[in-house]
């Protein structure tokens, strides 16, 4: 145990997805509540916590490099997060790490911090933590994590082995957190989990309570309640269950944003079966058509994998044909990468790297054309934009169709009479394949 005579300082490195970011926020909130200072440099810190990602091999490598940098620069390091579930792999590369915990092991992380850097004596009234906790996002938007883990066993994914099966947060707790965020000035809530549409499945959608009123633990009920807060609500990681159809009318009514992040992964029934994903492409196309009829303003985001083991040119062509017909607004594409522990590693007919690269390029070229055409349809129209930043050149914001960091932006050149978090009406004047330009109305 170190002898710390000053106000103890903790360095923090957060890697990976928004779900990991929320875990980091929770740990930082507890540390600040206990009187620890959180510092931005290794030099000033008595210890460094690295919250890791282990989803794909490149993320594992990034996490191991971050741990190594923290050890070199500081020497005292605690590791947590998804890669922490693979302690042997970390110890093999970095045996000097003090402690290692898996994901969502908040209490263990704090216990380890207390052991090496004892809790300070502090006046809680002099180190007040905001009621909404420490946030790593800008003040006007926040991620709202509604569950942990996943019940699916997709062959390319190891999340269940690291984060376990689905565990839904009580709906009263989720809604109370959302209310605290709104009271603190948040204008946009991004609902996240490993599987947002499965919310409540593990508790058989039991009835919970919020403000003394009964509320069903389900995605649809959650959306209905969040709509009463008067902010933008955006849904991410929505597995395409049949009941997803039930949230589309809420979007059409303006209760939640007309935005659906629904990872489809592929469009060949054979490849989807190998992935252990839903395989009826025709049914999915029919649903997309129906959703757009109900909510014409709907923005659809999805992710796909090319070069999955066994993928033939015919399978890939099915994927391109799907893109042409579905005309999705926002699309991410990944070249299949083996992940240690994933069932897909054992599948035959691995696709050569040069073929993956060639297919990825063809995929992106087609989707960029589709995205550009979709955005071109907005030129001349008026849209609502939430402002993210303002500088000497103007303002940058996002439309209802744009999630932070992963989607496009709306540029308001020369606009300075706004501030982050403002929601303004903008006339779109120009578009490319990702972004829009316009002027405030």
Curated annotation (Swiss-Prot):
Alphabetized Pfam families for the sequence: Radical_SAM, TRAM_2, UPF0004
Domain of life: Bacteria
Binding sites annotated in the UniProt record for [4Fe-4S] cluster 1: 17, 53, 82
SMART domains named among the record's database cross-references: Elp3
Main localization of the protein described in the UniProt heading: cytoplasm
Limits of the MTTase N-terminal domain: 8-118
Keyword Iron: yes
Alphabetical GO biological process terms: tRNA modification
Keyword Iron: yes
Cofactor note: Binds 2 [4Fe-4S] clusters. One cluster is coordinated with 3 cysteines and an exchangeable S-adenosyl-L-methionine.
Gene Ontology MF annotations: 4 iron, 4 sulfur cluster binding; aspartic acid methylthiotransferase activity; metal ion binding; protein methylthiotransferase activity
UniProtKB keywords: 4Fe-4S, Cytoplasm, Iron, Iron-sulfur, Metal-binding, S-adenosyl-L-methionine, Transferase
Enzyme Commission code(s) on record: 2.8.4.4
Domain Radical SAM core intervals: 136-373
Binding positions for [4Fe-4S] cluster 2 per the UniProt entry: 150, 154, 157
Localization of this protein: Cytoplasm
One GO CC term on file: cytosol
Family listed: Belongs to the methylthiotransferase family. RimO subfamily.
Purpose: Catalyzes the methylthiolation of an aspartic acid residue of ribosomal protein uS12.
UniProt-recorded name of the protein: Ribosomal protein uS12 methylthiotransferase RimO
Organism, scientific name: Escherichia fergusonii (strain ATCC 35469 / DSM 13698 / CCUG 18766 / IAM 14443 / JCM 21226 / LMG 7866 / NBRC 102419 / NCTC 12128 / CDC 0568-73)
Organism placement in taxonomy: Bacteria, Pseudomonadati, Pseudomonadota, Gammaproteobacteria, Enterobacterales
């Amino acid at each position: 145990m170190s002898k710390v005579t000053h106000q103890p300082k903790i360095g923090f490195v957060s890697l990976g997805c928004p779900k990991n970011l929320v875990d980091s926020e929770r740990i930082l909130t507890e540390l600040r509540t206990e009187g620890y200072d959180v510092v931005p440099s290794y030099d000033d810190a008595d210890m460094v916590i690295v919250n890791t990602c282990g989803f794909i091999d490149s993320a594992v490598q990034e996490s191991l490099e971050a741990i190594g940098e923290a050890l070199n620069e500081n020497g005292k390091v605690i590791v947590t997060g998804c890669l922490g579930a693979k302690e042997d792999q970390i110890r093999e590369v970095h045996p000097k790490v003090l402690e290692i915990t898996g994901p969502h092991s908040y209490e263990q992380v704090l216990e380890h911090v207390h052991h090496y850097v004892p809790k300070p004596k502090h006046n809680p009234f002099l180190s007040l933590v905001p009621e909404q906790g420490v946030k790593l996002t800008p003040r006007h938007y926040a991620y709202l994590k509604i569950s942990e883990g996943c019940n699916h066993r997709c062959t390319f994914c190891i999340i269940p082995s690291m984060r376990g099966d689905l565990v839904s947060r009580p709906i009263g707790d989720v809604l109370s957190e959302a209310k605290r965020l709104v009271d603190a000035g948040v204008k946009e809530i991004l609902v996240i989990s490993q599987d947002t549409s499965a919310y409540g499945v593990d508790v058989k959608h039991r009835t919970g309570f919020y403000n003394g009123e009964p509320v069903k633990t389900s995605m649809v009920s959650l959306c209905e309640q969040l709509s009463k807060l008067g902010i933008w609500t955006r849904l991410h990681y929505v597995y395409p269950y049949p009941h997803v159809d039930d949230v589309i009318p809420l979007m059409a009514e303006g209760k939640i944003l007309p935005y659906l992040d629904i990872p489809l992964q592929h469009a060949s029934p054979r490849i989807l079966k190998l992935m252990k994903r839903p395989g009826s492409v025709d049914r999915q196309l029919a649903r997309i058509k129906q959703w757009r009829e109900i909510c014409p303003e709907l923005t659809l985001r999805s992710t796909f994998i090319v070069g999955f083991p066994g993928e033939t040119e015919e399978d890939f062509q099915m994927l391109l044909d799907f893109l042409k017909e579905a005309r999705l607004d926002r699309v991410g594409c990944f070249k299949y990468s083996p992940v240690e522990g994933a069932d897909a590693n054992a599948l035959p007919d691995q696709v050569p790297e040069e073929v993956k690269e060639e297919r990825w390029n063809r995929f992106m070229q087609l989707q960029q054309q589709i995205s550009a055409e979709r955005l071109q349809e907005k030129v001349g129209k008026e849209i609502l934009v939430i402002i993210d930043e303002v500088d000497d050149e103007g303002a940058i914001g996002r439309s209802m169709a744009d999630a932070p960091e992963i989607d496009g932006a709306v540029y308001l050149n020369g606009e300075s009479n706004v501030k982050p978090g403002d929601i303004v009406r903008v006339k779109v004047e120009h578009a490319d394949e990702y972004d829009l330009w316009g002027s405030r109305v």
